[in-house]
Amino acid sequence: MLDYEWDNPSSIVLSGDERNPDSDPTRSSFSFFDPISHYNNDHRHITISPPLLSSFSNQQQQHHLTLYGQTNSNNQFLHHHHHHHSLYGSTTTTTPYGASDPIYHPHSSAPPASLFSYDQTGPGSGSGSSYNFLIPKTEVDFTSNRIGLNLGGRTYFSAADDDFVSRLYRRSRPGESGMANSLSTPRCQAEGCNADLSHAKHYHRRHKVCEFHSKASTVVAAGLSQRFCQQCSRFHLLSEFDNGKRSCRKRLADHNRRRRKCHQSASATQDTGTGKTTPKSPNDSGVKASSSPSSNAPPTISLECFRQRQFQTTASSSTSASSSSNSMFFSSG
C-alpha cells in the first residue's frame, strides 16, 4: 500500500487565490501553465528583499524574460495589491519583485520627487543590474555628514571643511557684519581721538586708551576734564589727583601706607635683633679668651696668682725692714 504522507501538509504550498483546488478538475488532468498565476505564486511567498540577493533576482529576471519576453509591470494582473501602502513611486524598480514587495509597489502614492534621489552606488549599479534604489535625500545627507568635535554649544570641524563651516556659521543679515567689526575693533575713548588700537599694546587695547592720552595731564572724556590713573587704569576727575601726579590720591595713600608698613616692620625686626645682644666689656672678653682651652699655652690665671703672691711677699719684707729700721732709730735716740 502506498504511503501518501497525508500527515505532512507542509510540502504542499497553495496560493491565496486557490481557495478550493479540487473544484477545478482540469488542473489535475492537464499540465496547463498559467503565466499570471505562476508569476503571482512564485513571488507572493518570497519575502527576501532584492538588495540582499541581487544575483538571485538577476536569475529570476532572465528566467521570466526567456518565458514571456520583456517583463511588463502593467496594472492588469496587479490589481489585488491596491491595499498596500508604499513610500516610493512606480519608477523605483523594474524587477519582478516590485509586484510582491509593498515597498516597491507601483500603485502607491509616492511623495514629491524633490524628496528623493537615485542611489547609483548600490550593488546592482553595474551593467547587468535590473533595479535602482530610491533613497530619500535625508538619508543621503546622513551618509555624507562631516565628523566634528562638539565642545559645548559649538562643533569644530577639520581644516578641510572650511567652506562648510563658513556656510554653516555665516550671518543671515549682511548689515550685522559691519556692526560687529566696528564693535570688536578697540578704539580710544578720549573725545576727538577715536584711534584704532588693533595694533597697539595689550594694555591700551584692554583699557581702550591710546598711549598719548594715557600719559596726558588733561583729557576730555565723556564731556569732562579727566586724567588717566596709572594704577586704577581708568579716567578720574582732576580733583582726585595731587598736582601733577599720574595716580589718584586714594591709590597713592594706599601705596604709601604699604611702603610705611614695610619700613616699620623692617626697623622693628632690626630693633628686636639688637635688643637681645648685650654689649660685652673687654675684661669679659679677655677672660673668656683666656678661659678658652688651648693645648700649647698654660693657663694665665696661675701665673698672675703667682706674681701677685710674689709681690705680696716683697711688700711684706720691705715693710718689715722699714719697721725694724724705725725701731732702731727710735731706740738709738
Swiss-Prot record:
Gene coding for it: SPL8
Impact noted for substituting S247A: Slight decrease in DNA binding and nuclear import efficiency
Bias (Low complexity) ranges: 289-299
Amino-acid positions noted as binding Zn(2+) 2 in the UniProt annotation, renumbered to this chain: C229, C232, H236, C248
Organism: Arabidopsis thaliana (Mouse-ear cress)
Expression by tissue: Expressed in shoot apical region and early floral tissues. Transcripts levels increase in developing pollen sacs, and decrease in later stage of anther development. Strongly expressed in the placental region of the carpels.
Biased composition (Polar residues): 264-284
Protein's GO biological process: anther development; cell differentiation; megasporogenesis; microsporogenesis
Highest taxon, organism lineage: Eukaryota
Zn finger residue spans: SBP-type: 185-262
Comp. bias regions, Basic and acidic residues: 16-25
A GO cellular-component term linked to this record: nucleus
Protein name: Squamosa promoter-binding-like protein 8
Residues binding Zn(2+) 1, per UniProt: C188, C193, C210, H213
Region ranges (Disordered): 1-28, 254-303, 314-333
